């Protein structure tokens, strides 16, 4: 079974070594590695070439392609098109792969050669109070996942090259949320099944969550802008606007200026905060196991701030994406739902 591992890079000099070292340490060696560089200006391609030369005995053939200006979708498509294997395993620069990642990711094909795609999992490399709080707020734990509805990130996923071709590749018109639309297109190929993806929770990759609120804002602004461009999660965004623009002002107004029982406003605010932060606080029990009691309290206090920053970033980014979509409404690629037919709406981490 020939397996090609593909990834894209752009100015990843500071992070790419983690991925390359973990690729060299795989218990199931890939048959080839294809990397597409989007035109890095920080010497990433040179670093990759030097690493490959130094670790030639530990690596399969490595093909490095340079495609200046390629976004992540274009980079993945270029790498997959150049890959020789009928099975593609995709990951991202900057992650650290578990040594058994590839072995676990391709194992379903040994049990069922008709497997179409496999969804791996991802866990945070969180070491300090802030990154632990960030991970608990925005990332699911294995216990949160329903295998029948899980849509994988392309930092840990495998699929046949035929499935990629039938999906039309990754959508190059979309700069963010591109792997979500690709997942929908793969799922549409197995309409009689709950999911086209076999869930492989032990195919794990580790990555570092955002280390500042500024970078987190930018990330979630772009995610929501991608939602707007692709017309994703209308109800979810509507609920967010209603919460912040209607429910929250109403509760605050009653708490401070109500004509009767102002305590009801405060009670509503407290209940809202608890519901808002309950699951992240529960995740802190697992993710913050190595923190001191004081550090866990500090992480718990950060959770509401992280949630608010993420939500405000989404509320700022989503209408920008919607406006972009309206300006480009004549683009046939935007009508992806029509092309896929009645596609099921699966849950994603939010």
Residue ranges and their predicted role:
Residues 43, 93-108, 184:
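Acidic donor-binding/catalytic loop of UDP-sugar-dependent glycosyltransferases
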Residues 29, 37-46, 95:
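A conserved acidic beta->alpha catalytic loop
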Residues 21-30:
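Short, acidic, metal-binding catalytic loop of nucleotide-sugar glycosyltransferases
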Residues 100-130, 194:
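Conserved donor NDP-sugar-binding/catalytic core segment of glycosyltransferases
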Residues 246-324:
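Membrane-embedded multi-pass helical conduit in multi-pass membrane proteins
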Residues 88:
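Short aromatic/hydrophobic "clamp" motif used to bind/position activated sugar donors
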Residues 171-234:
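Catalytic donor/gating beta->alpha subdomain of glycosyltransferases that bind UDP-sugars
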Residues 67-83, 104:
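Glycine-rich, basic loop-to-helix element that forms the pyrophosphate-binding segment
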């Amino acid at each position: 079974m020939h397996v090609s591992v593909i990834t894209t890079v752009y100015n990843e000099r500071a992070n790419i070594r983690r991925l390359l070292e973990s690729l060299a340490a795989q218990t199931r060696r890939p048959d080839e590695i294809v990397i597409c560089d989007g035109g890095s200006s920080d010497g990433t391609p040179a670093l990759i070439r030097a690493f490959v030369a130094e670790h030639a005995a530990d690596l399969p053939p490595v093909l490095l392609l340079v495609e200046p200006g390629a976004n992540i979708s274009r980079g993945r498509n270029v790498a997959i098109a150049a890959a020789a294997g009928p099975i593609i395993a995709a990951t991202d620069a900057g992650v650290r792969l578990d040594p058994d990642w590839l072995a676990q990711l391709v194992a379903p094909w040994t049990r069922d050669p008709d497997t179409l795609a496999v969804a791996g999992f991802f866990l945070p490399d969180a070491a300090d109070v802030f990154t632990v709080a960030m991970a608990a707020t925005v990332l699911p734990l294995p216990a949160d996942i329903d295998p029948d509805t899980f849509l994988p990130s392309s930092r840990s996923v495998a699929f046949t090259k035929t499935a990629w071709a039938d999906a039309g590749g990754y959508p190059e018109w979309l700069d963010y949320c591109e792997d979500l639309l690709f997942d929908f297109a793969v799922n549409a190929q197995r309409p009689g099944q709950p999911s086209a993806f076999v869930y492989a929770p032990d195919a794990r990759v580790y990555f570092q969550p955002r280390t500042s609120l500024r970078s987190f804002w930018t990330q979630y602004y772009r995610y929501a802008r991608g939602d707007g461009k692709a017309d994703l999660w209308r109800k979810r965004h509507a609920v967010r606007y209603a919460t912040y623009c209607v429910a929250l002002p109403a509760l605050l107004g009653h708490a401070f200026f109500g004509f009767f029982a102002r305590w009801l406003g405060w009670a509503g605010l407290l209940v809202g905060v608890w519901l808002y932060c309950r699951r992240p606080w529960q995740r802190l029990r697992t993710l913050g196991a190595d923190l001191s009691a004081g550090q866990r309290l500090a992480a718990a206090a950060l959770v509401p701030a992280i949630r608010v920053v993420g939500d405000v970033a989404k509320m700022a980014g989503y209408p920008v994406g919607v406006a972009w979509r309206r300006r480009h409404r004549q683009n046939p690629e935007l009508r992806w739902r029509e092309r896929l037919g009645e596609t099921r709406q699966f849950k994603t981490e939010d």
